[in-house]
């Protein structure tokens, strides 16, 4: 197991790197994994298992009004992509995990985006 707090930061940054410091991926998007895990708009849906019944391409996630408060799920939002502080299994854009909305940590962030 790698201890990320004491590991050699071979990219030159011990924690987060400045936005856009490395080349974009093939889609032209910067920093999709390894910098910070990002909050997304999706609510956690533990009861209906939304992602198994959602469209394959661009699932927008359930809305809170469509989720019953089952086992705390209606109070949790989704984090996606891994961060500098996560394990190797989190270092892909498709990784996701539910956390309570008030959860804060130094390796979490969000991405501002707009349609163009």
Report the location of each language-model feature.
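Acidic/aromatic-lined carbohydrate-recognition and catalytic surfaces
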Residues: 20
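Active-site neighborhood of thiol-dependent amide/isopeptide-bond enzymes
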Residues: 23
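Surface-exposed recognition segments
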Residues: 2, 6-17, 26, 31-116
